[in-house]
Amino acid sequence: MKPAILITITSTVVLGTMIVLFSSHWFMIWVGFEMNMLAIIPILMKKYNPRAMEASTKYFLTQATASMLLMLSIIINLLCSGHWTVSTIPNPVASTMITIALTMKLGLSPFHFWVPEVTQGISLSSGMILLTWQKIAPLSILYQISPSVNSNLLLMMAITSMLVGGWGGLNQTQLRKILAYSSITHMGWMAAIMVYNPTLAILNLTIYIMMTLGTFMLFMHSSSTTTLSLSYTWNKFPLMAPLILMLMLSLGGLPPLSGFIPKWMIIQELTKNDMIIMPTLMAITALLNLYFYTRLTYTTALTMFPATNNMKMKWQFETTKKTTLLAPLIVTSTMLLPLTPMLAALD
């Protein structure tokens, strides 16, 4: 893809998300979603092959269905309330339909089937955009309408997303699919707290984006797409093995890493609202994710596969890939726990 075309498409993706973030008019929000969806498809098809074509088609069909449902719910809301302004939604049917449309865009269960398939069919760089930037716009709208959302529906979707994300990632050897199931789980955590404390959901999203960006960049730097290729990291890129270890454990939510902060604060907030069963189930399902993250860390950093002398010497040569953003991302993804009191004060 030519640089000028890539810049135009990328700026359209960013502009679409910004329109959604800063609009208070339902029609402009819908326009922003459409701009974002149509501009992201060429990025998904950047490496033109049948698998990328299939992934882009699946993404388009899912997002188009969600957009159609969103527009229908906006019209129902307009007929009931008489205005286009984003505020509390008086009609329960419109509220439920908007929630379903947004969760379909986010990839929450039971609308999660497209996420692993699309992520696996595209490149690592496109997958990074899909699992980070593309989550911002739907979550921002869910944040704005959180007082009107059907709490039982959202909590049911949240707990099923955590179960699906945990069980789905257990048997995977493809890193992109593992990160896709990880995304489904994290979206479930955000949906669970959205009804009670939407600010915590935004905090969770911020930390999730930093951790996922760092993980994707490490995988791109080492050209790893499977657990087998990741097992050669210690021989080819010895400095990256401990970094991948820390990021994986942070994604799993182990203290004292940054990934522990949102899980801790969400469980604490739910217990404050007299919910006991929900946070207990969430803590148990988190163990499923922790298992496959730990398996990845074992493969990457705790085992050394047989290698030739040429492979062992490879890490000493200067790499051509840029890693400027990697350092701040890894620091923020692993060392934010001391800032927890300050983050808690933001609620």
From Swiss-Prot:
Source organism: Ailuropoda melanoleuca (Giant panda)
Segments traversing the membrane: 5-22, 26-45, 60-80, 96-116, 122-142, 153-173, 178-198, 200-220, 237-257, 274-294, 325-345
Entry keywords, A to Z: Electron transport, Membrane, Mitochondrion, Mitochondrion inner membrane, NAD, Respiratory chain, Translocase, Transmembrane, Transmembrane helix, Transport, Ubiquinone
Pfam families: NADH_dehy_S2_C, Proton_antipo_M
Annotated function: Core subunit of the mitochondrial membrane respiratory chain NADH dehydrogenase (Complex I) which catalyzes electron transfer from NADH through the respiratory chain, using ubiquinone as an electron acceptor. Essential for the catalytic activity and assembly of complex I.
Location in the cell: Mitochondrion inner membrane
PANTHER family linked: NADH-UBIQUINONE OXIDOREDUCTASE CHAIN 2
Family: Belongs to the complex I subunit 2 family.
Underlying gene: MT-ND2
Gene Ontology terms for molecular function: NADH dehydrogenase (ubiquinone) activity
Lineage: Eukaryota, Metazoa, Chordata, Craniata, Vertebrata
Catalytic activity, reaction form: a ubiquinone + NADH + 5 H(+)(in) = a ubiquinol + NAD(+) + 4 H(+)(out)
UniProt topology in membrane: Multi-pass membrane protein
An example Gene Ontology CC term for this record: mitochondrial inner membrane
Subunit structure: Core subunit of respiratory chain NADH dehydrogenase (Complex I) which is composed of 45 different subunits. Interacts with TMEM242.
Protein name, per record: NADH-ubiquinone oxidoreductase chain 2
EC numbers on record: 7.1.1.2
tRNA processing is among the record's keywords: no
BP term (GO), one: mitochondrial electron transport, NADH to ubiquinone
Domain of life: Eukaryota
